[in-house]
Amino acid sequence: LWKSEEEWYRGSFALSSLLPPWAEERKSFFVAWGNHHLKEAVSPMKKTSAKIPFVLLFSVGAVLFSAHAGGGFATGNQAHTYYVGLGWLGPVSAVGAMLLLTLTMREAMLMVNSRGLTSYKELFKTLYHPFDKLWVLFEIFFYIMVLMAVAAAISGAASALTEYFGLNYYVGIGLVGLVVLCLTIFGADLVRMASTYMGIAILVTAVAIYGVGIAWRGNLQEVLWQDFATQGFGNVPQAILNCFTYAGFQCVTLPTMIACGTPLTTKKACSRSMWISFVMNAVALVLSIFMLLSWQGFYTSVDGGTVIPTLTVCREMGMGWLTVVYGVCLLLCLLSTGVTTTFGFVARFEKLPLFRKISYAPARSAVVAAFIIVLSMTISLAGLSNIIKYGYGYCGYFAIAVVIVPFLTVGVYKNRKYLRAHPQAEGRSYEEAVKACQAAEPEEDTLPVPAGNFEKEGC
């Protein structure tokens, strides 16, 4: 079982601009399912004849999709910052990023489920073994990235207020920060209940805008061909870097995914679920890039048009009702992101000795929330584009070194080695493993008998 409620906060409050809170209800199902599974077995990956239903594979994959396609994605700023400037290579780089992300999540879930690990701390200790203390590198990345996400949510909401009502951006930051603080203290439960519908609405409206925008402009093929004719393969190095960087900062959702992925009790199930997620994520991201490429000449020429390019394009198409629906949903979604993420921060940090001197719990929570929001507001002064370009970007560089590369090299090796030594952890019986091995290598009579209890080993 997961060790404590605190561990769940640390895994779940990553539902930032990268994760709309409407995934919370689905995640709760996985938590209950996975914990029940762990109670009945020595390890989640044990001998089993039950076929994992497709709906479960799809649902776990959809959690990663919802983590990616949140309010930050819906603004269009992330796609503009990392892919539109690459021209025809933008969609290629985006597909590569989603492949890296899903492969990393697959290895992480496989490592957790095969060994019965109970936290991302144990996961990274296993990954980095014998250098166990390096697990703190992910902790550093995680908290910095989530703080950036809160700042991006405040900045995005303030930018939306500026676009719709002409409100001064800095006044908007103060107003949004105050609203987030009040909701965190008094209305977090209400926000969590409403966020399900807000998240669904923003995703549907954003995809609708992307589809209509591509058809409305009608010049996508011409834009791609023109860019290829002028740039050729000159942007390949930058495309590769952006591919890894984007996948890197999206790894902030890893704690949520290993929690939701506990029902995936075989290696094949982990793989299938992540391939489903890869298709969903790649299609959505490429669709947004295609739309922005089609309209790049327009929204880059508008003052402030690159901050929320999706809104800029929507206005130009003259679809007033869609513009209003999109704006309301985006604003509420970003606010809920700020509230739920701040609430998770409060639950984690109010236990520190620094704040224990405040005996009255509500006052202690309010002080911690105020500190976090003031810090996030300070960061948001840099503007949404700078937060995504530099804040997310440097976190992405860091994650390449501490998450992506380790999981896709050492992680792959350790998982394969562990599954060879513990065939039951792959969802096969020992007898089935022996037969498979004998069929592949007839000269060998048997396999080493695996331990009856799947101990948490370093490799």
What do these predicted ranges mean?
Residues K46-L56, V84-G90, S114-M145, E163-Y169, ...:
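Transmembrane-helix boundary/entry motifs in multi-pass membrane transporters
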Residues S28, A41-T75, V236-C243, T262-K268, ...:
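Membrane-interface "cap" regions at the ends of multi-pass membrane proteins
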Residues L292-G320:
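Membrane-interface interhelical connector segments
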Residues K51-V55, T81-M109, S277-V286, G393-I404:
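Extracellular loop-to-transmembrane helix junctions
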Residues Y143, V180, A201-T230, L292-S294, ...:
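Hydrophobic alpha-helical segments and their helix-loop junctions in multi-pass secondary transporters
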Residues A152-L161, N168-L175, L183-I214, I388-F407:
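Membrane-interface loop-to-helix entry segments
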Residues I52-A74, Y143-V146, V212-G218, W225-A282, ...:
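Hydrophobic, membrane-embedded alpha-helices of multi-pass small-molecule transporters
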Residues L64, V95-K121, M291-F298:
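Juxtamembrane transmembrane-helix boundary signature
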